[in-house]
Amino acid sequence: MGTRDDVPEAKVLVPVAVYCGSIPRTSAGPRVLPPGSINSSLPHGEGSLQPEPRALLNNEEPSQLLRGLGQLGGLKLDTPSKGWQARNGHPRNLRALSLGDQPLVLLPSPESEANSVARDTIQIKDKLKKRRLSEGLAASSRASLDPGGGPQGVPLHSTIPRATSQRLLRVPRPMPLIQSIPTTPEASGVKEKGLDLPGSIPGPHELRPGAQEAQISWQYLHCNDEKMQKSLGAIVIPPIPKARTVAATPSRVPGSLPSPLPPGQGVLTGLRAPRTRLARGSGPREKTPASLEPKPLASPIRDRPAAAKKPALPFSQSAPTLTAFSFDCAREACPPLKEEDQKEIGTKIQVTISKSAREKMQLKQMKEMELLRRLEEPRTGQELTSQCLGSQRAFMKEGLLPLRGSGTLSVPTRLSGPCRNDVSIILRKWASRASLPSIPISRQEPRFARHASANSLPAVLTLGSPEWEEEEEMDLRACKELRPFSNPELGLRDALQCLNSSDWQMKEKGLVSIQRLAACHSEVLTGKLHDVCLVVTGEVTNLRSKVSHLAISTLGDLFQALKKNMDQEAEEIARCLLQKMADTNEFIQRAAGQSLRAMVENVTLARSLVVLTSAGVYHRNPLIRKYAAEHLSAVLEQIGAEKLLSGTRDSTDMLVHNLVRLAQDSNQDTRFYGRKMVNILMANTKFDAFLKQSLPSYDLQKVMAAIKQQGIEDNDELPSAKGRKVLRSLVVCENGLPIKEGLSCNGPRLVGLRSTLQGRGEMVEQLRELTRLLEAKDFRSRMEGVGQLLELCKAKTELVTAHLVQVFDAFTPRLQDSNKKVNQWALESFAKMIPLLRESLHPMLLSIIITVADNLNSKNSGIYAAAVAVLDAMVESLDNLCLLPALAGRVRFLSGRAVLDVTDRLAVLVASVYPRKPQAVERHVLPILWHFLNTATRNGTLPGPSGNIRGVVCRLSRSLQEHMGSRLLDFAASQPKHVLKTLQELLDSESLGGSRKATDRGVAPDSKTTGSSYPFQLD
């Protein structure tokens, strides 16, 4: 290795141009230019830079300089001045570099050459300004006419003549906004492999002799992503610090030569990014607001242990610059931005975001990062990044991530442009921007995503939009459902903790985890199935419909995954789901129906039969009875009549009674399903044997007769699904004959009936309006409909009686309305309608009695009193011969106060019916008496919640004895002995008690007494 004394001194005279025009503002920086050298062999007009003179030390050798020049890490930058380099995006300046073994000459100082060219500079200053302006406009117009950028491979030419550009040292260079790009593992990989850094200075054999130069390339700025990756390899461009910041770089002793580094160990860093970005030529410039400037990150030198040991440079020598890039890719530069694109992204304002808003955005970012992470895991790093960039939502929401560290956001003032109307247009515009350079993106997205820009702000502005939130949650849920847990036990514990939280979002997360466990780890749920079902069932009644809907769906997933293991939990879940079937929200009803269907399909059929019968058949809500009958019908079809009728006698009797109850329900759809199930049993031969073994009730015979006479509706279509057809009975002639289409308009019939048909049309509209009010969702509208029906019964009784079934199909549910005000008002109004309608109510009598009897157990005193008033009105106004079978058939299905009230009315009806038709009393009332005497205990109470019935049984037996006489004991002789004995004791004690009360209080023996405490045994 030679010494510095071996280097001969050389002196070169170089013209220096001083530009006196206006200089745009740039960041503040050091003012002293270090000596440098630029390749003089570059063609004029394409970036040939005139170097400043430099005196070479006597002891410097060209070989040392050449070895130091071979590595980019050896380049040293002193504090640059604020001049053309900062304005055009060039590095500040370079030291003089020795390239080859050519003789070196000393360069004169800039001060000695400034006076020689000052006179020429002043003369051409104004002329040059005008010429540059005209040529810049021409270049801008040519670029706008050629948006595609022209064919690749055409070299760029300066808009200033060669001599002028050489004198002014001005090379127009487009400089993009360099975003903060973090370090990546690829950079360290290149260092370890020892690869040469791309863009290094060529060897001496490639340069002309006698030249001291450094090539500055546009390759990094203009080549596309693929070529950039090939040219830069794994080089990571570090963040560019702001003013007054020191970049941590490998340092050396000031004044010494840069020591050669091993290949691949040089790390390129740079000063602050220029504030102007120029298009090709002297086109229009786009200024970047301060809020979008990249923030400094940790220097990549921290990853190099060897470099960390070196002392830091002083501030004046601390920042090397990017150099040694060739001009090869400059020929493939893209054309400048279009005018509308420049206007769109040029106008921006500063918006301050509060701390709470930033926290909400951070929460949103966490969800987005979780979604992207789930989608990126199965793929490699290269494929992962390309797919992330191709995703619409990930691309549009990239601008959210840098908001974590700052409280400001750059928001364009133009938000109604045409490119914001469609996401695809935005993506196409972003991808096809010709003047934007291709900058390699870090592979750690979206955590280190690019800053917010004009094309990524729609995601910010639509933050909290229901559409975005719903899509994101659905995608996240779908992504999680397909993936099993790495630790299922821990996932179950976390899910239960989330469900116990008071936050609805945590509850939703817990429910999604339960769905994942049910789909992928069903064996884990088996151990804690009861706890899981209990917690999930509790969320079905959540006031937030979103959580309730998700809980209902989760129950359906549990049924599908665990199947027969859910038998023990089916009853409680079925009650909860049936309760939700009466919800006003249709999507809740659909979800509950799907979960019930999943229960019927997966649990044991016998268990489904018991659950639906106990939870739905006896429910007060008609909608719940309807849906219970629907699913019960599906269960019966799967079991089959053969197996159902092969059970014990008690179970078969209970099943038949339940089906008869459904077949006589007030809701027409429930009646349809009930008759359908009875028809299934009737079609089997064992049903006849069942009828012979057990005495069929009057209700069963009536239902069977109706089925045989009318049959089941065709095509298994619900009556309500057929829609409300036009009432044909209203559109008839006066003589009852229907109107024929072939009848002439001038015929004698039609002329006489025009006024009548017009009045009938008004009646049809009136009935339609009445039906709409009775079935309205608002309780005030339903109360108004009940009032209109009462007025219509008073004013137009014939109209109501002619369409009684259609009217009462809408009115009967109001007698059991979920709203207490509507329920009580309907009962009170119906008590007033009964004397007006009288015998016309017989077709609807059974369904009305079922509904009214259920109200007798109401805890509301007003509803109970109104129901009792309806019973009394029916006994007084209706035909007792028709009323007796209906009331007697309901006693066995009643409990509580309803049994006492209905049995007390039976004792009254016996007195009026037996003289007219004794067979009716013997057939319907005597079985009720035997039932009471057979099941009553010694103290006169029935098992269950019915209470003490001694008083009503005594009145019933005395009423029967008064009208039947000794025939009552004759019928009792065929019953078990304890029944006969109990009846005799009851009659004797009643007669003695009545005589004693008549003697002591002066009350007639036949007066009604209730609440007697005498037991059934004799004294």
Swiss-Prot record:
Region (Disordered): 28-54, 131-158, 249-311, 991-1019
Bilayer-spanning residue ranges: none
GO biological process: microtubule cytoskeleton organization; negative regulation of cytoskeleton organization; negative regulation of supramolecular fiber organization
Entry GO terms, CC: cilium; cytoplasmic microtubule
Polar residues biased stretches: 1007-1019
GO MF term list: microtubule binding
Annotated family: Belongs to the Crescerin family.
Protein name: TOG array regulator of axonemal microtubules protein 2
Organism, as annotated: Homo sapiens
